Amino acid sequence: QGKKRTGEISTLQYIFEFQSMICELTNMDVANASLYDGATATAEAVFMATSQTRRNKVLVSKTINPRILDVIKTYTKYRDIEIIVVDMVDFCLDKEALRTKLTDDVAALVVQYPNYYGVIEDFQEVVDLVHNNKSLFIMNADPSTLSVLKTPGEIGCDIVCGEAQTLGIPLNFGGPYLGYMATTNKLLRKLPGRIVGM
């Protein structure tokens, strides 16, 4: 009985520490206990945004990994959510194209940081455009880069998610992968999965 209890406490402790580290890396308020992988975490972030805003259109930058886009489309196919891809210019999000697509029924914009082409985009103007439209800004970010790049929290992200395998998990036959997600206190109740607190 004592050993089992110690095991449970140890598990809760390391999950809490994982969440704390993700919050430190991303500079966000709260993180969950992880998700399947980075792509499904991004799809879950889309669900969070549509639920929070009660809107059914989501813009996705063409500069994200096409496999992540495929997963988002698969997840949203039967959920009455319209996915609209925003074009790119010089391997960066086309801000003019974004302005034309940013209508009052858009729940969120999804971007990748650094993007699929390895470009570190400056999203400050984009975040302002999205927030002025009362939409949410979702960032799929590589956590191994966040110790040197401007953090999602500093940029003004509402939801940050991604693939945490890059933090050092060895790959074996196509896995294991680890999706992470962090958000603001305002969106805490919409966060999927489990949260370990103290």
Model-derived segments and their meaning:
Residues 1-2, 67:
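Glycine- and acidic residue-enriched flexible segments with recurrent GG/GxG motifs
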Residues 2-41:
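Conserved N-terminal alpha-helix of the aminotransferase class I/II PLP-enzyme fold
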Residues 40-198:
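Conserved PLP-enzyme active-site core in the AAT-like
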